[in-house]
């Protein structure tokens, strides 16, 4: 593989012409964060910001106080998984990506236990979306559930909740 530094300027094309405009763009800024070990309790029917207290990585220092502020214009891909503990049967649960304090994209899952009992000790939902960001935009994750206060799983479990994003190279 060629180092990125060697992919700038003009390169010869097969036709004999020169290729120009080739850049070594990458997928940064990027981050991944998880909740603290004990997670957080989410109140019934209230939209609450998830507190992401542990950074797994943060390539450019753009994630702080549970908020991603890329400061680099472009398209970003966001991924979030929320693991709820003790969700009741037949419950609406939501994850929303907020952009600049307003809902940008929401996903919902409906918890149903085929045995007819409670929804079980663990339920999960995932959000995947691409968003355009200007230099001053910021992004956060909010959740809502309709069955009473529920616990968002933290980092004590290998399959817990997480929030991540990265810039799409060239976008």
Which role fits each region the language model picked out?
Residues 21-91, 95, 99, 107-115, ...:
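Terminal (often C-terminal
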Residues 117-138:
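Short, surface-exposed tryptophan/glycine-enriched loops
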Residues 142-148:
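Short beta-strand-plus-loop segments that form exposed binding edges in beta-rich domains
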């Amino acid at each position: 593989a060629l180092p990125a530094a060697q992919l700038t300027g003009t390169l010869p094309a097969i036709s004999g012409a020169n290729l120009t405009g080739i850049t070594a763009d990458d997928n940064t800024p990027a981050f991944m964060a998880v909740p603290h070990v004990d997670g957080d309790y989410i109140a019934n029917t209230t939209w609450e910001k998830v507190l992401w207290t542990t950074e797994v990585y943060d390539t450019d220092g753009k994630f702080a106080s549970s908020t991603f502020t890329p400061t680099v214009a472009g398209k970003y891909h966001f991924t979030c998984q929320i693991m709820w503990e003790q969700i009741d049967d037949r419950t609406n649960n939501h994850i929303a990506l907020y952009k600049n304090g307003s809902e940008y994209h929401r996903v919902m899952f409906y918890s149903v236990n085929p045995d007819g009992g409670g929804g079980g000790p663990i339920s999960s939902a995932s959000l995947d979306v691409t968003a355009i960001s200007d230099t001053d935009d910021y992004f956060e994750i909010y959740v809502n559930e309709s069955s009473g206060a529920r616990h968002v799983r933290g980092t004590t479990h290998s399959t817990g909740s997480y929030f991540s994003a990265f810039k799409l190279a060239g976008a």
